[in-house]
């Protein structure tokens, strides 16, 4: 029932993309490292926006880059998410998907809030959630030991179960996305470090909600269908890998002119991008060359300028 033609096709695609990313990391790791910061920025911003957590753009960027201290409740949530994502990216091999790990990550998610909500199950006694989460983690780990079972099928199922268990009063949805990153990285699918999966989830939130609802129907009775959410998540990963593939091709291309590289950076970037972010992605291109390329793109109406001064950003005009 789970192995529909669409899902089988997506699995094949993702296995191929995984191999390509691994090969590029072996040959062009330095070039690819330039886009990790941008992906992290997009991930933290998108995941928190999905939960209605709003922070002014200038403050958001400083918070994500750890260049200011959080002040409001929303800023503290952003800072907590930033730190947990950073920890997962750096230490995923040492973070098994166990209840103790999940509780620790949830505690860290709220470490700036000064509240006891972090690291505690939602019900007073804690037992029902604790038992359900322990059973889920044990079943997942056992399934991973079976070489016949593809982690890309197990991970969406884990997410559906986790979201239906809903072990926390606050932060369950954000934790689910952090756990998605953790499980993907541990399974060798590191695309989220170079292309923001959360940004794609945000842009397709209606489809996300619909797929999750369909796969959650009759969950308590144990007769739910995991296929809708599995197909959705695999499609999301394919989109992320395609975006990464385009960026990697551009970064490792030898024949493109510098203005064309600036153009492609903006075109392939999801959302707004600043001049400083462009410069970080292309350290061999001078600031003057980037400024000239931006002016030319503006004159030809390929991009739109947003804001001014230090916080000026640019976005690609979709019709071009």
Regions from the PLM with identified roles:
Residues 1-320:
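FIC/Doc superfamily catalytic core
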């Amino acid at each position: 029932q789970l192995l529909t033609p669409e899902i089988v096709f997506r699995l094949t695609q993702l296995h191929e993309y995984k191999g390509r990313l691994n090969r590029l990391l072996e040959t062009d790791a330095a070039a690819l490292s330039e886009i990790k910061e941008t992906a992290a920025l997009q991930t933290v911003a998108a995941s928190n926006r999905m939960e209605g957590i709003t922070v002014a753009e200038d403050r958001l960027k400083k918070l994500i880059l750890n260049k200011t201290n959080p002040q409001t409740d929303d800023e503290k949530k952003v800072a907590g998410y930033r730190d947990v994502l950073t920890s997962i990216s750096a230490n995923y091999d040492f973070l098994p998907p166990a209840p103790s790990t999940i509780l620790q990550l949830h505690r860290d998610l709220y470490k700036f809030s000064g509240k006891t909500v972090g690291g505690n199950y939602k019900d007073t006694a804690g037992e029902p959630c604790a038992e359900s989460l322990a059973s889920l983690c044990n079943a997942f780990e056992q399934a991973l030991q079976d070489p016949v079972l593809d982690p890309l099928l197990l991970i969406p199922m884990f997410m559906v179960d986790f979201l239906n268990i809903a072990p926390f009063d606050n932060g369950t949805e954000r934790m689910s996305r952090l756990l998605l990153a953790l499980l993907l990285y541990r399974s060798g699918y590191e695309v989220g470090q170079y292309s923001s999966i959360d940004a794609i989830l945000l842009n397709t939130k209606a489809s996300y909600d619909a797929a999750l609802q369909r796969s959650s129907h009759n969950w308590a009775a144990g007769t739910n269908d995991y296929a809708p959410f599995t197909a959705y998540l695999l499609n999301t990963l394919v989109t992320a890998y395609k975006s990464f593939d385009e960026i990697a091709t551009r970064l490792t291309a030898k024949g493109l002119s510098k203005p064309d590289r600036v153009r492609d950076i903006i075109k392939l970037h999801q959302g707004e991008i600043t001049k400083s972010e462009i410069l970080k992605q292309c350290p061999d291109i001078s600031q003057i060359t980037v400024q000239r390329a931006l002016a030319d793109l503006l004159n030809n109406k390929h991009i739109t300028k947003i804001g001014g001064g230090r916080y000026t950003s640019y976005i690609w005009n979709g019709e071009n």
